[in-house]
Structure formats: structure tokens, C-alpha cells
């Protein structure tokens, strides 16, 4: 899925986890966000520049799983399997962590590079949830976890930096040593 960009990232997550808000913050777009499942059915893409790199962002439909029973699940699953994103940023609603982590685990099982954008941390704290991101990262096999409140723009720059750092690390891990 290369269209003259340096990186392609996929935004995945449950409905209403804030994927489109993250997409808008990253790309400067103004995609309409809605507070109901099924708002985004097709994938949308946009671009942004960061640290001299042109990065394509693909906003996948919100889905609870990759079981491929609904149109949203099919679109999301097919892109993850065939679109070859450099990294999948799974946007997770911190106030509903358990339900959201099911999709994270399914995407990890596809053996794709994953970052977790732990969104709506302000709402989670309001209802008394304290999430240890280091512990969560360890529990997910070392997947980077970035705290954010996308609606307020908090954590967006950290997410951009994490995407670059993580994709550079993944690239080094995949590059074989030269044969001498």
C-alpha cells in the first residue's frame, strides 16, 4: 500500500474509541466523528509530515473483533492482512479497557507491529481507573503504550514520536546481518 509515502500506519480500534479523532489530529483532517457504532464503515486515509517523513494514516472502521461477520470487520481485517501497514496503532478506550484489549490481542496474533494509543485517559481517571502503562505494555509482550486524550490533543506528539521510533526499531530487527 505504498503511495509515495515513507510509512503507512493503520488506525484500528473499537467503535467510539476515538480513532477518527486521532486521525484528525494526526492529519489535520476534519472527518466527522459520531457517537454511535458503524459511523466509519469504509477506511479513510490522510497524510502528515513528521521529522522529514511523509506518513500515510489509514483510519479503519471501528470493530470489536476481526471475526469478519460485519462489513466493518471485513474492511478492517482485509486491510490488516493485505495492506501491509508498517505499524498498526490500536486506539483503546481507557475507560473500557478489558473490552478494547480483545481486539489488541487479535491484531497481535496476526504478528503485525502494534502500538497501543491509550485514549480517553482523563475519563478513565474520572471513574477511578488507574492504568499502569508499563505493566500493560509488559502484559502485551512489550507493545508500546502511549497515554492520550485525543479530543484535547494530548499525547499526539508523543504518538508521532513513538511511531517513528517503533518503526525504526522494527526495521532494524527485520534487517538481516550482511553475509561476509
Predicted regions and their residues:
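Helical mechanochemical/support elements of P-loop NTPase systems and associated helical scaffolds
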Residues: 37, 41, 56, 68, ...
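Conserved nucleotide-binding/hydrolysis micro-motifs of P-loop NTPases
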Residues: 29, 38, 62-63, 94-98, ...
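Flexible inter-domain linker/hinge segments
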Residues: 179-180
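Conserved C-terminal guanine-recognition region of P-loop GTPase G domains, centered on the G4
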Residues: 49-52, 75-145
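Residue-level signature of catalytic and energy-coupling elements of molecular machines
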Residues: 22-23, 41, 59, 76, ...
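Canonical P-loop GTPase G-domain recognition
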Residues: 122-176
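Conserved G1/Walker A P-loop phosphate-binding module
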Residues: 1-65, 83
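Signal for well-folded cores of large energy- and translation-related assemblies
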Residues: 27, 65, 80-81, 108, ...
